Amino acid sequence: MKFPKILFRSAPSSVLYLPEIDGLRSLAILAVVLFHSSGYFYVKNLERGMYTATESAGDELIRWVLSHGFLGVQLFFAISGFVLALPFARRARAGESPPDYRSYILRRVTRIEPPYVIALCFYAAASLFLAPESFRPIQYMAGLCYARNAFFDDGTWLFYVSWSLEIEIQFYLIAPLLSLIFRLTSPILRRGTLAVAIVAAGFYAATYRLSGVEPMPLGGPLQHGWWLGPELAFFLIGMLVADIASTVHSKSSDKLVSFCWDVAWVAGLLLVLSSYRMLEHSAAGITALLVGLFLVMLGTLRSKWVRGALARPIPSMVGGACYTIYLFHPLPLAFCGKLLLPLTGNRYGWDMLLVAIPMGIAVTVSLLLLFPLVERPFMNRHWPQELVLAIRERALGRVIRLIRGQDQAIANRPTASR
Protein backbone atom coordinates (compact mmCIF):
# COMPACT_ATOMS: atom_id res chain seq x y z
CA MET A 1 0.00 0.00 0.00
CA LYS A 2 1.51 3.28 -1.12
CA PHE A 3 -0.17 5.60 1.41
CA PRO A 4 1.23 4.01 4.59
CA LYS A 5 4.69 3.78 3.02
CA ILE A 6 4.65 7.48 2.20
CA LEU A 7 3.24 8.41 5.60
CA PHE A 8 5.52 6.33 7.80
CA ARG A 9 8.67 5.94 5.70
CA SER A 10 11.72 6.85 7.73
CA ALA A 11 14.67 8.72 6.33
CA PRO A 12 17.77 6.97 7.67
CA SER A 13 20.57 9.46 8.03
CA SER A 14 23.31 6.85 7.88
CA VAL A 15 24.58 4.42 5.28
CA LEU A 16 24.95 1.97 8.18
CA TYR A 17 21.18 1.63 8.52
CA LEU A 18 20.13 -1.77 9.87
CA PRO A 19 16.35 -2.40 9.73
CA GLU A 20 16.59 -5.16 12.33
CA ILE A 21 17.89 -2.61 14.86
CA ASP A 22 14.80 -0.50 14.23
CA GLY A 23 12.78 -3.67 14.72
CA LEU A 24 14.49 -4.17 18.07
CA ARG A 25 13.62 -0.57 18.94
CA SER A 26 9.96 -1.41 18.27
CA LEU A 27 10.10 -4.10 20.96
CA ALA A 28 11.70 -1.64 23.38
CA ILE A 29 9.13 1.09 22.81
CA LEU A 30 6.19 -1.31 23.03
CA ALA A 31 7.57 -2.64 26.31
CA VAL A 32 7.82 0.87 27.75
CA VAL A 33 4.39 1.98 26.54
CA LEU A 34 2.70 -1.17 27.84
CA PHE A 35 4.52 -0.79 31.16
CA HIS A 36 3.18 2.74 31.55
CA SER A 37 -0.27 1.71 30.33
CA SER A 38 -0.56 -1.19 32.77
CA GLY A 39 1.02 0.87 35.53
CA TYR A 40 -1.63 3.56 35.20
CA PHE A 41 -4.48 1.13 35.83
CA TYR A 42 -2.51 -0.70 38.51
CA VAL A 43 -1.95 2.43 40.60
CA LYS A 44 -5.43 3.86 40.08
CA ASN A 45 -7.11 0.60 41.02
CA LEU A 46 -4.91 0.21 44.09
CA GLU A 47 -6.11 3.66 45.15
CA ARG A 48 -9.69 2.47 44.62
CA GLY A 49 -9.09 -0.58 46.79
CA MET A 50 -9.13 -3.05 43.90
CA TYR A 51 -6.81 -5.99 43.21
CA THR A 52 -7.11 -7.27 46.77
CA ALA A 53 -8.23 -10.80 45.86
CA THR A 54 -5.80 -13.67 45.35
CA GLU A 55 -4.46 -13.62 41.81
CA SER A 56 -4.59 -16.60 39.49
CA ALA A 57 -1.57 -18.09 37.76
CA GLY A 58 -2.60 -16.24 34.60
CA ASP A 59 -2.69 -12.93 36.45
CA GLU A 60 0.77 -13.60 37.84
CA LEU A 61 2.15 -14.43 34.39
CA ILE A 62 0.76 -11.23 32.87
CA ARG A 63 2.08 -9.19 35.78
CA TRP A 64 5.49 -10.87 35.43
CA VAL A 65 5.77 -9.91 31.76
CA LEU A 66 4.41 -6.36 32.05
CA SER A 67 6.45 -5.57 35.16
CA HIS A 68 9.61 -5.86 33.05
CA GLY A 69 8.45 -3.32 30.48
CA PHE A 70 10.53 -0.54 31.99
CA LEU A 71 13.63 -2.50 30.98
CA GLY A 72 12.88 -1.37 27.44
CA VAL A 73 14.76 1.78 28.45
CA GLN A 74 17.88 -0.26 29.24
CA LEU A 75 17.49 -1.92 25.83
CA PHE A 76 17.36 1.56 24.29
CA PHE A 77 20.60 2.40 26.10
CA ALA A 78 22.29 -0.70 24.67
CA ILE A 79 21.02 0.15 21.18
CA SER A 80 22.33 3.72 21.51
CA GLY A 81 25.73 2.43 22.57
CA PHE A 82 25.79 0.18 19.51
CA VAL A 83 24.58 2.76 16.98
CA LEU A 84 26.90 5.53 18.18
CA ALA A 85 29.94 3.27 18.48
CA LEU A 86 29.59 1.38 15.20
CA PRO A 87 30.96 4.16 12.92
CA PHE A 88 33.95 4.60 15.24
CA ALA A 89 34.58 0.84 15.35
CA ARG A 90 34.31 0.40 11.57
CA ARG A 91 36.62 3.32 10.86
CA ALA A 92 39.15 2.01 13.32
CA ARG A 93 39.11 -1.43 11.67
CA ALA A 94 39.53 0.19 8.26
CA GLY A 95 42.49 2.26 9.48
CA GLU A 96 40.59 5.52 8.99
CA SER A 97 40.43 8.51 11.31
CA PRO A 98 37.41 8.71 13.64
CA PRO A 99 34.43 10.95 12.82
CA ASP A 100 35.03 14.63 13.48
CA TYR A 101 33.78 15.52 16.98
CA ARG A 102 32.30 18.84 15.89
CA SER A 103 30.31 17.19 13.11
CA TYR A 104 29.32 14.40 15.46
CA ILE A 105 27.91 16.81 18.07
CA LEU A 106 26.25 18.99 15.43
CA ARG A 107 24.47 15.95 14.02
CA ARG A 108 23.26 14.92 17.47
CA VAL A 109 21.91 18.43 18.05
CA THR A 110 20.15 18.77 14.69
CA ARG A 111 18.70 15.26 14.88
CA ILE A 112 17.71 14.91 18.55
CA GLU A 113 17.09 18.43 19.81
CA PRO A 114 14.17 19.65 17.61
CA PRO A 115 11.71 16.84 18.49
CA TYR A 116 12.74 17.14 22.14
CA VAL A 117 12.09 20.90 22.20
CA ILE A 118 8.72 20.36 20.50
CA ALA A 119 7.82 17.80 23.16
CA LEU A 120 9.02 20.09 25.94
CA CYS A 121 6.78 22.89 24.65
CA PHE A 122 3.89 20.44 24.35
CA TYR A 123 4.19 19.36 27.99
CA ALA A 124 4.65 22.95 29.17
CA ALA A 125 1.42 23.95 27.41
CA ALA A 126 -0.36 20.88 28.79
CA SER A 127 0.82 21.69 32.30
CA LEU A 128 -0.41 25.27 32.02
CA PHE A 129 -3.79 24.04 30.82
CA LEU A 130 -4.28 21.00 33.06
CA ALA A 131 -2.49 21.99 36.27
CA PRO A 132 -1.49 25.68 36.22
CA GLU A 133 -0.99 25.71 40.00
CA SER A 134 1.88 23.22 39.71
CA PHE A 135 3.50 24.74 36.61
CA ARG A 136 7.10 25.72 37.33
CA PRO A 137 8.88 27.38 34.38
CA ILE A 138 12.28 26.79 35.97
CA GLN A 139 11.78 23.04 35.55
CA TYR A 140 11.26 23.42 31.81
CA MET A 141 14.29 25.68 31.55
CA ALA A 142 16.31 22.97 33.28
CA GLY A 143 14.73 20.39 30.98
CA LEU A 144 15.86 22.43 27.99
CA CYS A 145 19.42 21.96 29.25
CA TYR A 146 18.84 18.25 29.96
CA ALA A 147 19.35 18.91 33.67
CA ARG A 148 15.85 18.83 35.16
CA ASN A 149 16.24 15.53 37.02
CA ALA A 150 19.53 16.63 38.53
CA PHE A 151 17.87 19.52 40.39
CA PHE A 152 14.21 18.63 40.84
CA ASP A 153 12.50 15.60 42.33
CA ASP A 154 8.73 15.89 42.54
CA GLY A 155 5.64 14.33 41.01
CA THR A 156 4.34 17.38 39.14
CA TRP A 157 6.54 16.84 36.07
CA LEU A 158 4.34 15.67 33.18
CA PHE A 159 7.36 14.94 30.98
CA TYR A 160 8.53 12.17 33.28
CA VAL A 161 10.18 10.12 30.54
CA SER A 162 12.78 12.86 30.05
CA TRP A 163 15.06 11.30 32.68
CA SER A 164 16.38 8.74 30.20
CA LEU A 165 16.93 11.37 27.50
CA GLU A 166 19.08 13.38 29.89
CA ILE A 167 21.21 10.29 30.51
CA GLU A 168 21.41 9.60 26.76
CA ILE A 169 22.80 13.09 26.20
CA GLN A 170 25.50 12.49 28.80
CA PHE A 171 26.57 9.37 26.92
CA TYR A 172 26.48 11.16 23.55
CA LEU A 173 29.01 13.68 24.85
CA ILE A 174 31.57 11.10 25.95
CA ALA A 175 30.92 8.36 23.37
CA PRO A 176 33.76 9.56 21.06
CA LEU A 177 36.16 9.46 24.02
CA LEU A 178 35.03 5.97 25.02
CA SER A 179 35.35 4.90 21.38
CA LEU A 180 39.10 5.40 21.55
CA ILE A 181 39.09 1.80 22.77
CA PHE A 182 38.51 0.75 19.17
CA ARG A 183 41.95 2.07 18.21
CA LEU A 184 43.48 -0.90 20.03
CA THR A 185 44.55 -3.43 17.42
CA SER A 186 44.13 -6.55 19.54
CA PRO A 187 40.52 -7.84 19.58
CA ILE A 188 41.20 -9.68 22.82
CA LEU A 189 42.48 -6.51 24.49
CA ARG A 190 39.60 -4.38 23.16
CA ARG A 191 36.84 -6.76 24.14
CA GLY A 192 38.51 -7.75 27.37
CA THR A 193 38.75 -4.09 28.39
CA LEU A 194 35.10 -3.51 27.48
CA ALA A 195 34.06 -6.64 29.37
CA VAL A 196 35.92 -5.52 32.49
CA ALA A 197 34.33 -2.07 32.19
CA ILE A 198 30.88 -3.66 31.88
CA VAL A 199 31.47 -5.77 35.00
CA ALA A 200 32.70 -2.75 36.97
CA ALA A 201 29.82 -0.55 35.80
CA GLY A 202 27.38 -3.38 36.49
CA PHE A 203 28.73 -3.79 40.02
CA TYR A 204 28.27 -0.07 40.59
CA ALA A 205 24.74 -0.26 39.19
CA ALA A 206 23.93 -3.13 41.54
CA THR A 207 25.17 -1.34 44.65
CA TYR A 208 23.58 1.96 43.61
CA ARG A 209 20.19 0.69 42.55
CA LEU A 210 19.21 -2.26 44.73
CA SER A 211 16.85 -0.20 46.89
CA GLY A 212 13.27 -0.80 45.83
CA VAL A 213 10.68 1.45 47.42
CA GLU A 214 7.67 1.30 45.09
CA PRO A 215 5.23 -1.58 44.56
CA MET A 216 5.54 -3.65 41.42
CA PRO A 217 5.14 -3.10 38.55
CA LEU A 218 6.08 0.55 38.98
CA GLY A 219 9.30 0.40 40.93
CA GLY A 220 11.01 -2.38 42.75
CA PRO A 221 14.74 -2.88 43.13
CA LEU A 222 15.87 -1.33 39.83
CA GLN A 223 15.58 2.43 40.40
CA HIS A 224 16.89 4.98 37.91
CA GLY A 225 19.03 7.95 38.78
CA TRP A 226 19.84 11.29 37.24
CA TRP A 227 23.31 10.65 35.83
CA LEU A 228 25.05 8.24 33.49
CA GLY A 229 26.93 6.13 36.04
CA PRO A 230 24.20 3.61 36.98
CA GLU A 231 23.30 3.13 33.31
CA LEU A 232 26.78 3.06 31.78
CA ALA A 233 27.01 -0.74 31.69
CA PHE A 234 24.09 -0.94 29.25
CA PHE A 235 25.69 1.51 26.81
CA LEU A 236 28.96 -0.40 27.06
CA ILE A 237 27.18 -3.61 26.04
CA GLY A 238 26.16 -1.86 22.83
CA MET A 239 29.76 -0.79 22.27
CA LEU A 240 30.99 -4.36 22.75
CA VAL A 241 28.45 -5.63 20.23
CA ALA A 242 29.52 -2.86 17.82
CA ASP A 243 33.14 -4.02 18.07
CA ILE A 244 32.12 -7.61 17.31
CA ALA A 245 29.89 -6.49 14.44
CA SER A 246 32.69 -4.42 12.92
CA THR A 247 35.04 -7.39 12.66
CA VAL A 248 32.72 -10.37 12.21
CA HIS A 249 30.27 -10.55 9.33
CA SER A 250 26.80 -10.38 10.85
CA LYS A 251 25.19 -12.81 8.42
CA SER A 252 26.21 -16.45 8.67
CA SER A 253 25.87 -18.91 5.80
CA ASP A 254 25.82 -21.77 8.30
CA LYS A 255 22.16 -22.55 9.05
CA LEU A 256 23.04 -24.27 12.31
CA VAL A 257 25.01 -21.25 13.55
CA SER A 258 22.16 -18.91 12.62
CA PHE A 259 19.68 -21.16 14.40
CA CYS A 260 21.88 -21.18 17.49
CA TRP A 261 21.78 -17.39 17.50
CA ASP A 262 17.98 -17.52 17.24
CA VAL A 263 18.00 -19.71 20.34
CA ALA A 264 20.49 -17.38 22.04
CA TRP A 265 18.22 -14.41 21.33
CA VAL A 266 15.25 -16.15 22.96
CA ALA A 267 17.44 -17.17 25.90
CA GLY A 268 18.59 -13.57 26.26
CA LEU A 269 15.02 -12.33 26.28
CA LEU A 270 14.11 -14.84 28.99
CA LEU A 271 17.09 -13.68 31.04
CA VAL A 272 15.91 -10.08 30.73
CA LEU A 273 12.39 -11.07 31.76
CA SER A 274 13.75 -12.98 34.74
CA SER A 275 16.15 -10.30 35.92
CA TYR A 276 13.61 -8.10 37.69
CA ARG A 277 12.44 -10.79 40.12
CA MET A 278 16.04 -11.87 40.66
CA LEU A 279 16.91 -8.30 41.66
CA GLU A 280 14.71 -8.70 44.72
CA HIS A 281 17.26 -11.09 46.17
CA SER A 282 20.75 -10.26 44.90
CA ALA A 283 22.90 -8.53 42.32
CA ALA A 284 22.50 -11.66 40.20
CA GLY A 285 19.62 -9.83 38.57
CA ILE A 286 21.97 -7.20 37.18
CA THR A 287 24.15 -9.98 35.79
CA ALA A 288 21.15 -11.68 34.18
CA LEU A 289 20.05 -8.37 32.70
CA LEU A 290 23.48 -7.57 31.25
CA VAL A 291 24.00 -11.04 29.79
CA GLY A 292 20.45 -11.09 28.46
CA LEU A 293 20.82 -7.73 26.72
CA PHE A 294 24.13 -8.83 25.20
CA LEU A 295 22.53 -11.99 23.75
CA VAL A 296 19.53 -10.04 22.48
CA MET A 297 21.72 -7.40 20.82
CA LEU A 298 24.16 -9.80 19.18
CA GLY A 299 21.43 -12.31 18.36
CA THR A 300 19.54 -9.60 16.50
CA LEU A 301 22.51 -9.23 14.15
CA ARG A 302 23.57 -12.88 13.83
CA SER A 303 20.30 -14.86 13.84
CA LYS A 304 18.16 -15.73 10.82
CA TRP A 305 14.54 -15.98 11.90
CA VAL A 306 14.59 -13.32 14.60
CA ARG A 307 16.59 -10.96 12.44
CA GLY A 308 14.23 -11.49 9.52
CA ALA A 309 11.18 -10.88 11.70
CA LEU A 310 12.59 -7.68 13.21
CA ALA A 311 13.61 -6.35 9.78
CA ARG A 312 10.04 -6.65 8.45
CA PRO A 313 8.39 -3.36 7.43
CA ILE A 314 5.99 -3.02 10.36
CA PRO A 315 8.50 -3.58 13.20
CA SER A 316 11.13 -1.42 11.53
CA MET A 317 8.51 1.27 10.85
CA VAL A 318 7.43 1.40 14.50
CA GLY A 319 11.05 1.31 15.66
CA GLY A 320 11.96 4.10 13.27
CA ALA A 321 9.37 6.30 14.98
CA CYS A 322 10.23 5.19 18.53
CA TYR A 323 11.65 8.58 19.52
CA THR A 324 8.37 10.31 18.67
CA ILE A 325 6.36 7.62 20.46
CA TYR A 326 8.59 7.78 23.53
CA LEU A 327 8.42 11.57 23.75
CA PHE A 328 4.67 11.93 23.45
CA HIS A 329 3.02 8.76 24.82
CA PRO A 330 2.60 9.66 28.54
CA LEU A 331 -0.15 12.25 28.14
CA PRO A 332 -2.33 10.29 25.66
CA LEU A 333 -2.03 7.25 27.93
CA ALA A 334 -3.20 9.26 30.94
CA PHE A 335 -6.07 10.81 28.98
CA CYS A 336 -7.29 7.49 27.56
CA GLY A 337 -6.70 5.75 30.88
CA LYS A 338 -8.95 8.20 32.67
CA LEU A 339 -11.73 7.51 30.19
CA LEU A 340 -11.33 3.72 30.40
CA LEU A 341 -10.71 3.41 34.14
CA PRO A 342 -14.40 2.68 34.95
CA LEU A 343 -14.12 -0.45 32.78
CA THR A 344 -11.42 -1.94 35.02
CA GLY A 345 -11.02 -3.14 38.58
CA ASN A 346 -12.32 -6.70 38.65
CA ARG A 347 -9.28 -8.79 37.75
CA TYR A 348 -5.76 -7.65 37.03
CA GLY A 349 -5.20 -10.09 34.19
CA TRP A 350 -8.43 -9.29 32.38
CA ASP A 351 -7.94 -5.55 32.89
CA MET A 352 -4.54 -5.78 31.24
CA LEU A 353 -5.63 -8.03 28.37
CA LEU A 354 -8.88 -6.23 27.54
CA VAL A 355 -8.06 -2.60 28.38
CA ALA A 356 -4.44 -1.70 29.20
CA ILE A 357 -2.65 -3.62 26.45
CA PRO A 358 -5.09 -2.63 23.64
CA MET A 359 -4.94 0.98 24.85
CA GLY A 360 -1.13 0.97 24.81
CA ILE A 361 -1.02 -0.48 21.30
CA ALA A 362 -3.64 2.01 20.08
CA VAL A 363 -1.69 4.97 21.49
CA THR A 364 1.51 3.65 19.90
CA VAL A 365 -0.13 3.34 16.48
CA SER A 366 -1.82 6.73 16.71
CA LEU A 367 1.46 8.46 17.57
CA LEU A 368 2.90 7.22 14.29
CA LEU A 369 0.87 10.03 12.74
CA LEU A 370 3.08 12.55 14.56
CA PHE A 371 6.30 11.08 13.24
CA PRO A 372 6.28 12.82 9.81
CA LEU A 373 5.72 16.17 11.51
CA VAL A 374 7.95 16.18 14.58
CA GLU A 375 10.80 13.82 13.75
CA ARG A 376 11.23 12.74 10.14
CA PRO A 377 12.16 16.20 8.77
CA PHE A 378 15.11 16.29 11.17
CA MET A 379 16.41 12.89 10.08
CA ASN A 380 17.73 14.63 6.95
CA ARG A 381 21.12 15.90 8.07
CA HIS A 382 20.74 18.87 5.71
CA TRP A 383 17.37 20.05 7.01
CA PRO A 384 18.70 23.41 8.32
CA GLN A 385 19.99 24.32 4.86
CA GLU A 386 16.79 23.08 3.25
CA LEU A 387 14.67 25.14 5.62
CA VAL A 388 16.71 28.27 4.91
CA LEU A 389 16.31 27.71 1.16
CA ALA A 390 12.59 27.10 1.59
CA ILE A 391 12.22 30.43 3.40
CA ARG A 392 14.36 32.33 0.90
CA GLU A 393 12.63 30.85 -2.11
CA ARG A 394 9.21 30.72 -0.44
CA ALA A 395 9.14 27.13 -1.59
CA LEU A 396 6.63 25.15 0.43
CA GLY A 397 7.49 22.11 -1.65
CA ARG A 398 10.88 21.83 0.04
CA VAL A 399 9.21 21.64 3.45
CA ILE A 400 6.74 19.05 2.19
CA ARG A 401 9.58 16.93 0.82
CA LEU A 402 11.28 17.07 4.22
CA ILE A 403 8.07 15.91 5.89
CA ARG A 404 7.73 13.12 3.33
CA GLY A 405 11.30 12.02 3.98
CA GLN A 406 12.50 12.67 0.45
CA ASP A 407 16.14 13.55 -0.15
CA GLN A 408 16.91 16.96 -1.57
CA ALA A 409 19.46 17.98 -4.14
CA ILE A 410 21.38 19.76 -1.42
CA ALA A 411 22.28 16.37 0.04
CA ASN A 412 24.86 16.06 -2.72
CA ARG A 413 26.38 19.47 -2.13
CA PRO A 414 29.51 19.86 0.00
CA THR A 415 28.86 21.46 3.38
CA ALA A 416 31.01 22.63 6.23
CA SER A 417 29.80 19.78 8.42
CA ARG A 418 30.78 17.05 6.00
Language model features: what each stretch is:
Residues R25, A119-F122, C145, S211-E214, ...:
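Hydrophobic, membrane-facing alpha-helical anchors
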Residues E231, F235, M239-L240, D262-R376:
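Alpha-helical transmembrane segments of multi-pass integral membrane proteins
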Residues H36, R91, I244-T247, S303:
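Generic structural signal for alpha-helix termini and adjacent loop/cap motifs
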